[in-house]
């Protein structure tokens, strides 16, 4: 079945809402944090059964083991042992972010350009690029991308689009926007020829230009997408992100779920959830964990700091995650990081992922009580 979305409560204080997305492989309570499992695995997290929705990257799975190989093994759910919802992207994000830098990197660097060595050629047909793994020449078109996502079998899929960096000149911006929306229409047409249980979100572009964002909303709203995803360049700082999300959500109907692509750090979630965003994807908690950044209700702990060398408190007192429940202390976790023990990143990732789920539960409760 295609997804069903129900709004359970609309906040009286903001545009925030609590909802539920039903898919073939289970339900997602929203707003939800969606961790990124790049190669079909959450780095440092072995048990993802309590994660309501997981984001897998089509580009990396095309490169290895191959989308057809995954299909031959029963699809992504069976391949990775997950009986819960999965969302995949088109593959375009990785291709263009390898050339231009990711959205998060763009925000940090104000769009300083990276090399474009990975992209060989781009035109209206699609994009030719080199595999980061072995240098093979690969091709991705709307139809190729959607077929790959059909092979993978995710519950929610994304049409092919072109990710532009912040520094793009206006002339190419217009050309790219037209190409992106043509690609999205082709993606949707290919999907609808054999939708099965899968659903597709339309991606809204427009950079930081309100008029272009409104046009993007109109494009997605006029087509039978199952949900909306806010993508493209979101600016150079949190203020820009908030502005883009505000104007975009104000021009979307309330009936479809809304996803914010590539943004899922805590400051951004708190700043944008009030505009009616239903899901956020990011590798933020596991990446932070691998660098010794521990998320807690008292703020982030830089566990490598000397102050934790003799701290026998749990990572976070009162936390029910497996790491804290088993008595992993701050001093012990710091020791593991200092000696480069792989378990350090595992325990930290388990805690951070649990913390993110706890925060989303808190956010849903605040919305239900009209406090957010």
Curated annotation (Swiss-Prot):
Pfam families: TGT. GO terms for molecular function: metal ion binding; tRNA-guanosine(34) queuine transglycosylase activity. Belongs to the queuine tRNA-ribosyltransferase family. Keywords: Glycosyltransferase, Metal-binding, Queuosine biosynthesis, Transferase, tRNA processing, Zinc. It catalyses: 7-aminomethyl-7-carbaguanine + guanosine(34) in tRNA = 7-aminomethyl-7-carbaguanosine(34) in tRNA + guanine. Residues 262-268, 286-290 are annotated as: RNA binding. Substrate binds at residues 89-93, 161, 232. The active site is at residues 89, 281. The keyword Chaperone does not apply. Binds 1 zinc ion per subunit. Its EC number is 2.4.2.29. Its cofactor is Zn(2+). It comes from Chlamydia muridarum (strain MoPn / Nigg). Pathway: tRNA modification; tRNA-queuosine biosynthesis. InterPro entries: TGT, TGT-like_sf, tRNA_ribo_trans-like. SUPFAM superfamilies: tRNA-guanine transglycosylase. GO terms for biological process: queuosine biosynthetic process; tRNA-guanine transglycosylation. Homodimer. Within each dimer, one monomer is responsible for RNA recognition and catalysis, while the other monomer binds to the replacement base PreQ1. The keyword Protease does not apply. This is Queuine tRNA-ribosyltransferase. Zn(2+) binds at residues 319, 321, 324, 351.
């Amino acid at each position: 079945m295609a997804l069903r979305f129900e709004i359970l409560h609309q906040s009286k204080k903001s545009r925030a809402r609590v909802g539920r997305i039903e898919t073939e492989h289970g339900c997602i309570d929203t707003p939800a944090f969606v961790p990124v499992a790049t190669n079909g695995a959450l780095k440092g997290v072995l048990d993802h059964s309590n994660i309501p929705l997981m984001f897998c990257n089509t580009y990396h799975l095309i490169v290895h083991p191959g989308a057809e190989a995954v299909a031959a093994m029963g699809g992504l759910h069976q391949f990775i042992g997950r009986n819960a919802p999965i969302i995949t992207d088109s593959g375009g994000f990785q291709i263009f972010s390898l050339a231009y830098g990711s959205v998060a990197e763009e925000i940090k660097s104000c769009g300083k350009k990276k090399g474009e060595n990975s992209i060989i050629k781009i035109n209206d047909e699609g994009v030719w690029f080199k595999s980061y793994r072995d240098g093979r020449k690969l091709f991705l078109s709307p139809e190729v991308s959607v077929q790959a996502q059909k092979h993978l079998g995710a519950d929610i899929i994304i049409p092919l689009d072109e990710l532009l960096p912040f520094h793009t000149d206006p002339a190419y911006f217009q050309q790219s926007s037209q190409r992106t929306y043509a690609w999205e229409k082709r993606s949707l047409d290919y999907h609808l020829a054999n939708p099965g249980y899968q659903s597709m979100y339309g991606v809204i572009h427009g950079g930081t230009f309100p008029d272009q964002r409104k046009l993007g909303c109109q494009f997605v709203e006029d087509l039978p997408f199952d949900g909306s995803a806010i993508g493209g360049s979101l600016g150079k700082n949190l203020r820009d992100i908030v502005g883009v999300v505000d104007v975009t959500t104000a021009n979307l109907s309330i009936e479809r779920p809304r996803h914010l692509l590539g943004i899922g750090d805590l400051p951004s979630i708190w700043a944008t959830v009030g505009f009616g965003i239903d899901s956020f994807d990011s590798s933020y908690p596991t990446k932070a964990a691998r660098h010794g950044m521990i998320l807690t209700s008292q703020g982030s702990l830089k566990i490598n700091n000397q102050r934790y060398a003799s701290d026998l408190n749990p990572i976070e007192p009162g936390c029910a995650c497996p790491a804290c429940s088993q008595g992993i202390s701050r001093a012990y976790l710091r020791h593991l990081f200092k000696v480069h023990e792989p378990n350090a990143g595992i325990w930290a990732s388990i805690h951070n992922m649990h913390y993110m789920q706890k925060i989303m539960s808190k956010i849903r409760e605040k919305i239900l009580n009209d406090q957010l």
